[in-house]
Amino acid sequence: MLKRFVNSIWEICQKDKFQRFTPVADAIDTFCYEPIHQPSSPPFIRDAVDVKRWMMLVVIALFPATFLAIWNSGVQALVYGSGNAQLMESFLHISGFRSYLSFIFNDIGVFSILWTGCKIFLPLLIISYSVGGVCEVLFAIVRKHKIAEGLLVTGILYPLTLPPTIPYWMAALGIAFGVVVSKELFGGTGMNILNPALSGRAFLFFTFPAKMSGDVWVGSNPTKIKESLLAMNSTAGKSIIDGFSQSTCLQTLNSTAPAVKRVHVDAIASNILQMPHVPTESVIHSQFSIWAESHPGLMLDKLTLEQLQNFVTSPLSEGGLGLLPTQFDSAYSITDVIYGIGKFSSGNLFWGNIIGSLGETSTFACLLGAIFLVVTGIASWRTMVSFGIGAFITAWLFKIFSILIVGKHGAWAPARFFIPAYRQLFLGGLGFGLVFMATDPVSSPTMKLAKWIYGLFIGFMTIVIRLINPAYPEGVMLAILLGNVFAPLLDYFAVRKYRRRRI
C-alpha cells in the first residue's frame, strides 16, 4: 500500500506540468525507503545507513532532552501558574527523588504535567518542521535539486533552544531565517558555515530581545505567570528580596553588578546557611566586631533579614561591608547561585528541575544524548571534552586570579567570579550546546587537532561572555557561532601542521 502511494506520487510528478515537484516525490520516497540515487557530494557514507538514517540517530539522541523539555515545562507551568504559595514552597523544598515523586503524584499529577508540557512544546515543534520544510521544498523546486535531510535535526534542535513563551509567529520567523539565510543561501545542507538552529535563535535574540530574555521562561502566558507570582508573594508575605521569582541562574548572574563583592555574598551565606566558616570569614568577622559595638547582643548567624541588610550595606567606617543598599537584592540572589541554595541546587541544575529554554535545563538528558552520539560515532568526543575542559579551566582561572590579585581570599573581587567551576557546566545551555550544537559535523572542524582547539576556544569564550559581557546572560550561543566562523581556519592550520609532519 505504501509502495503504491509512493509510485502514484512519482507518476504525477512525471507529467510535464508537475515535473518541478519531483524533489517532493524524491523526498517522500527517500523517507519511506532507501535512496534511489547515489550522492554526488559529501557526506559519502559507504554503509547500509544512509544520511537520512544517520540524521535520525541524532533525533533519537535528542529524545531524552525532548521528553524532559515536555515534562519540565509542564511542571514549572503548573507550579508557577498555580497562585498557590504553599505549593510553591513545597516545590522549592524538594530534597531528593522520593520527595520529588511524592510532590508529583500527590500535588500535581503525571497526566496534567504531560498535557501541559505537550501544549507548550508540540506547537513549536510543528511550526519548526512545517515552516522549515516549506522553505526547503521551495528552494529545492526553484534550484531543481534534491530535498536534503538536514531539517530532520534542525527542526527539532531549534524549538529546544527557545523559551516556552515565544510567540508562534516569531518561532516561524526564526526557523525561516535559520534555514534560508544560514543554510540555503550558502548552498544547502552540507554547505552552511553557521549552525542553522543557532542562527535562527540568534536572529530572534537580537531582533526581539524582550521575548528571548527576562520573564519568559515559564508557561505559555507571561502575564498569567506574573500575576500568579504576585499573588503567591502576597499570600506568603514575601518581600522583593526573598520573594518567589522566575529568574534563571544566568539572569541572576548577569544582573549582579561588579559592586557586589565576594565578601557580601559570604556574609549573606554565613547567615542563611549558618555556616561557621566561609572563605572571607576573617574580613567579615573583623568588620562585624566593629558594627556590633553599635548593635549589642547580635550574632552574625542569628541576624534577621533587615539586620543582615543593615550590616552588609553599612559604610566600612562603621563596621559594615559597604554595599550599596540598592545592590543588596542582587547580592542576596546570587548567593543562591554560588552556594547552590533552594531552586539553584546542584541537583536541580543537573537533573533539570529548573526554568530555562525548553531543551537546555537537564544536563543529565544531554549526557544521555552524548553517550549515544559517541557510541554510534556520529559526534566528536574530542569537541565535547575540549569544550568542557575549556569552560571549566576558564571559570577556575577567573576565581584563582581574583584571589591572587585582590588578596584576602578575593574578598573585594566581584562575586560573579566565584561560582564554582563545575557549576558553570550545569548552567544555562552549556550541556545542550556542548553535545548537540558544537558537534555539528558541517559547521565544526574535521581535523582532530582542530576539534581540540575549536572546543577549547568555545569553552573559553562561553565563560568570558558570561562573566564579563554585561549585555548577554548566556555565552554558549555566541561562542559556538564564533567558533563556526573560525572552524575552516582551524582546519586549514591543522592540515598544514599535518603535512609538515609527513614531510
From Swiss-Prot:
It is found in: Cell inner membrane. The modification FMN phosphoryl threonine is found at residue 248. GO terms for biological process: respiratory electron transport chain; sodium ion transport; transmembrane transport. Pfam families: NQR2_RnfD_RnfE. It catalyses: a ubiquinone + n Na(+)(in) + NADH + H(+) = a ubiquinol + n Na(+)(out) + NAD(+). It is an enzyme of class 7 (translocase). GO terms for molecular function: FMN binding; oxidoreductase activity, acting on NAD(P)H, quinone or similar compound as acceptor. InterPro entries: NqrB, NqrB/RnfD. It is a multi-pass membrane protein. The chain crosses the membrane at residues 55-75, 94-114, 120-140, 161-181, 186-206, 361-381, 387-407, 417-437, 452-472, 475-495. Keywords: Cell inner membrane, Cell membrane, Flavoprotein, FMN, Ion transport, Membrane, NAD, Phosphoprotein, Sodium, Sodium transport, Translocase, Transmembrane, Transmembrane helix, Transport, Ubiquinone. One of its GO terms (cellular component) is plasma membrane. Its EC number is 7.2.1.1. Its main location: membrane. Its cofactor is FMN. NQR complex catalyzes the reduction of ubiquinone-1 to ubiquinol by two successive reactions, coupled with the transport of Na(+) ions from the cytoplasm to the periplasm. NqrA to NqrE are probably involved in the second step, the conversion of ubisemiquinone to ubiquinol. Composed of six subunits; NqrA, NqrB, NqrC, NqrD, NqrE and NqrF. Belongs to the NqrB/RnfD family. This is Na(+)-translocating NADH-quinone reductase subunit B. The gene is nqrB.
